């Protein structure tokens, strides 16, 4: 009888690897440990080529399956938190700006664009990440178009978000550093916003449009399609990736830093130049500009921290020219998630730094809101209610400041000017002025102006 050919046996884990300098012994043990760690990392990332096969699932014990389930649950929890903060927070910001007419200003138009881009990112990009956690591994198949659309939306809205923060910094630069005549008007602001959205659309579309005339793409998993940090270098070239990062991220980052530097310089000089002040309205403006500059700095820091790793990985992939041959690593996934998290951080900054948003979210800061919007709020009320509001505000200032309330007033027309000044120093407000506030505060009660002041976030 002819003997049946036996299948080639699998080498043992301790066998000597080809090209190994020291066969057996400690080298074999280190190799086995490295292979074991690599398999655990593959299970943790999920959606790899052999993760869903029955024989692979049978070969794994209950411990790797438990670790895999815990990793998927943790990732789903993080994505859910980002989704809730981005969607609910940005909806709240947009609702406040649209609801209150006095907030429909130039600066808030840029913030509205930023919130809209973050909201669309949460609604159109995060569902693909949830699908990736539970989709079977292998070829993306019917989800290929959905993955391509998700990557397009993520790129487009990410560029819009970066441009919007740069425009906010530019608006603050023009309002604080430049003379009042150089401030951005409504028409110029709309032109800048339209240019930002069109530029984002133009930079994002070639990722998929330039791919059609080329050779058919190789099959890839949904996970690999979603977390690819740059276009295919073989089709679009490394120059496109570098140009995209420089034009859409690095240049806006430099503009933010430039504006922030000059804002800090101007505020520091103003702190020396404007003392003593003749009216406490100017003191309110000074401290509000200081807090405004701090808020802009916080936004810039988070934008750079969230988008910096992504830009670095795009440049790294462009230099290595090997993005298509490698599966997305943990760094790619973390970098993309950081860009999504930036949209969830911005509403938190607004809620902490702005009394309007915090009041909308249920925090009781009515006095600060009325103080910094006195020229908008009081003319719409009766004279008796105005007097009661002023008296209640004075009493609140005196109770909060104690000894500081005895500070002599810089405004001789009002005995409580020093109190309000000190209260403003303790509780500064976020106020962006488009026009100078009236010097005497009593002019608010005598004039009923039709146009409202700028009190943006």
UniProtKB/Swiss-Prot annotation:
One of the record's GO cellular component terms: endosome membrane
Membrane-topology annotation of the record: Multi-pass membrane protein
Primary location recorded for the protein, binned into one broad class: membrane
Gene3D superfamilies linked: Rhodopsin 7-helix transmembrane proteins (1.20.1070.10)
GO BP, one annotated term: G protein-coupled receptor signaling pathway
Protein name per Swiss-Prot or TrEMBL: G-protein coupled receptor 135
Subunit structure: Interacts with MTNR1B. Interacts with ARRB1 and ARRB2 in a spontaneous and agonist-independent manner; leading to the internalization of GPR135 in the endosomal compartment.
Keywords linked to the UniProt accession: Cell membrane, Endosome, G-protein coupled receptor, Glycoprotein, Membrane, Receptor, Transducer, Transmembrane, Transmembrane helix
Record topological domains on the Extracellular side: 1-64, 131-156, 211-235, 317-329
Keyword Glycoprotein: yes
Record-linked SUPFAM superfamilies: Family A G protein-coupled receptor-like
Membership in a protein family: Belongs to the G-protein coupled receptor 1 family.
Annotated PANTHER family: G PROTEIN-COUPLED RECEPTOR, G-PROTEIN COUPLED RECEPTOR 135
Gene expressing this chain: Gpr135
GO molecular-function term, one example from the UniProt record: arrestin family protein binding
Source species, domain of life: Eukaryota
Lineage, top ranks: Eukaryota, Metazoa, Chordata, Craniata, Vertebrata
Transmembrane segments: 65-85, 110-130, 157-177, 190-210, 236-256, 296-316, 330-350
Organism: Rattus norvegicus (Rat)
InterPro entries reported for this sequence: GPCR_Rhodpsn, GPCR_Rhodpsn_7TM
Ranges per topology, Cytoplasmic: 86-109, 178-189, 257-295, 351-457
Protein's job: Orphan receptor. Has spontaneous activity for beta-arrestin recruitment. Shows a reciprocal regulatory interaction with the melatonin receptor MTNR1B most likely through receptor heteromerization.
Places the protein is found: Cell membrane; Endosome membrane
Carbohydrate attachment residues: 47
Start and end residues of each stretch annotated as Disordered: 1-27
């Amino acid at each position: 009888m002819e003997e049946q050919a036996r299948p080639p046996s699998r080498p043992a884990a301790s066998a000597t690897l080809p090209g190994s300098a020291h066969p057996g012994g400690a080298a074999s043990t280190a190799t086995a440990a490295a292979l074991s760690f690599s398999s655990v990392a593959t299970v943790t990332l999920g959606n790899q080529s052999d993760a869903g096969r029955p024989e692979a699932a049978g070969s794994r014990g209950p411990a790797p399956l438990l670790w895999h389930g815990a990793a998927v649950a943790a990732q789903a929890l993080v994505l859910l938190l980002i989704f809730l903060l981005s969607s609910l927070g940005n909806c709240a910001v947009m609702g406040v700006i649209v609801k209150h007419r006095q907030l429909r200003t130039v600066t808030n138009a840029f913030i509205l664009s930023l919130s809209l881009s973050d909201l669309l990112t949460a609604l159109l990009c995060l569902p693909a990440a949830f699908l990736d956690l539970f989709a079977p591994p292998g070829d993306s198949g019917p989800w290929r178009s959905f993955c391509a659309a998700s990557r397009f939306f993520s790129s487009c809205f990410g560029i819009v978000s970066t441009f919007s923060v740069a425009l906010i910094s530019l608006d603050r630069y023009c309002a604080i550093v430049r003379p009042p005549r150089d401030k951005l008007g409504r028409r110029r602001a709309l032109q800048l916003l339209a240019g930002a959205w069109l530029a984002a659309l133009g930079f994002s579309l070639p990722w998929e449009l330039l791919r059609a005339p080329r050779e058919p793409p190789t099959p890839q998993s949904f996970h690999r399609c979603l977390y690819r940090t740059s276009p295919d270098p073989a089709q679009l070239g490394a120059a496109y990736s570098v140009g995209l990062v420089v034009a859409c991220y690095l240049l806006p980052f430099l503009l933010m830093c430039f504006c922030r530097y000059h804002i800090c310089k101007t505020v520091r000089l103003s702190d020396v130049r404007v003392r003593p002040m003749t009216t406490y309205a100017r003191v309110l403006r000074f401290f509000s500009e200081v807090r405004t500059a701090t808020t802009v700095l916080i936004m810039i820091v988070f934008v750079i921290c969230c988008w910096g790793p992504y830009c670095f990985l795009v440049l790294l992939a462009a230099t290595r020219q090997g993005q298509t041959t490698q599966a997305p690593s943990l760094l790619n996934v973390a970098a993309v998630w950081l860009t999504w998290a930036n949209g969830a951080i911005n509403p938190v900054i607004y809620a902490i730094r702005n009394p309007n948003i915090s009041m909308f979210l249920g925090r009781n800061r009515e006095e600060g809101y009325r103080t910094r919007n006195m020229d908008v709020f009081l003319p719409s009320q009766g004279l008796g209610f105005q007097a009661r509001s002023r008296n209640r505000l004075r009493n609140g200032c005196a109770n909060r400041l104690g000894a500081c309330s005895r500070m002599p007033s810089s405004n001789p027309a009002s005995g409580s000017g020093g109190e309000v000044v000190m209260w403003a120093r303790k509780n500064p407000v976020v106020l962006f002025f488009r026009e100078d506030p009236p010097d005497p505060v009593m002019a608010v009660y005598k004039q009923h102006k039709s146009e409202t002041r700028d009190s943006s976030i």
